[in-house]
């Protein structure tokens, strides 16, 4: 279904508890507009849990990763983005960095991240899944809904479209 975040704000702001993500994120990935139910991860400079999560087949979910805003390595690259797209993920939000930005632009998935960084992350296996995470003035919870387009990112407790 077609939507715009501006349209969602016009229609639902004031009647639904919308949260609007601060405009910190750059677009990556071949899809500019995406939405779905949220799955949350909290990791720091480690992508093992990200890979495990994206390897699971889902029906149109969006992975929201709190990477602590680290600018010392990338949490997501071309291989993980392709894995996500192949398994039904609609989008990935990374509060941190990505790499392989040219390749990401060819993968049929929506991606938002703070920046790029050429160094890959550690592979130690730490992190938490399905926990409350907070960044960019928004509380992200598993099973809430995220809507992203060229204008921004909106989060709602309820399905809007």
UniProtKB/Swiss-Prot annotation:
A divalent metal cation binds at residue 100. Substrate binds at residues 77-80, 99. The keyword DNA repair does not apply. GO terms for molecular function: 4-hydroxy-4-methyl-2-oxoglutarate aldolase activity; metal ion binding; oxaloacetate decarboxylase activity; ribonuclease inhibitor activity. Pfam families: RraA-like (PF03737). GO terms for biological process: regulation of RNA metabolic process. Its cofactor is a divalent metal cation. Divalent metal cation. Its EC number is 4.1.3.17, 4.1.1.112. It catalyses: 4-hydroxy-4-methyl-2-oxoglutarate = 2 pyruvate; oxaloacetate + H(+) = pyruvate + CO2. It comes from the Bacteria. Keywords: Lyase, Metal-binding. Catalyzes the aldol cleavage of 4-hydroxy-4-methyl-2-oxoglutarate (HMG) into 2 molecules of pyruvate. Also contains a secondary oxaloacetate (OAA) decarboxylase activity due to the common pyruvate enolate transition state formed following C-C bond cleavage in the retro-aldol and decarboxylation reactions. Belongs to the class II aldolase/RraA-like family. Homotrimer. This is Putative 4-hydroxy-4-methyl-2-oxoglutarate aldolase.
């Amino acid at each position: 279904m077609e939507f715009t975040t501006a349209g969602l704000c016009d229609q639902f702001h004031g009647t639904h508890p919308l949260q609007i993500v601060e405009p910190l994120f750059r677009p990556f990935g071949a899809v500019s507009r995406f939405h779905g139910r949220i799955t949350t991860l909290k990791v720091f400079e480690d992508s093992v849990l990200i890979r495990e999560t994206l390897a699971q087949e889902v029906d149109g979910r969006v992975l929201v990763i709190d990477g602590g805003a680290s600018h010392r390595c990338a949490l997501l690259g071309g291989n993980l983005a392709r894995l996500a797209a192949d398994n039904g993920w609609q989008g990935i939000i990374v509060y941190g960095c990505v790499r392989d930005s040219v390749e990401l632009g060819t993968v049929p998935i929506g991606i938002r991240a703070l920046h790029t960084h050429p160094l890959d992350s550690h592979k130690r296996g730490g992190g938490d899944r399905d926990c409350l995470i907070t960044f960019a003035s928004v509380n992200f919870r598993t099973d809430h809904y995220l809507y992203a387009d060229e204008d921004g990112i909106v989060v709602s407790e309820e399905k809007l479209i």
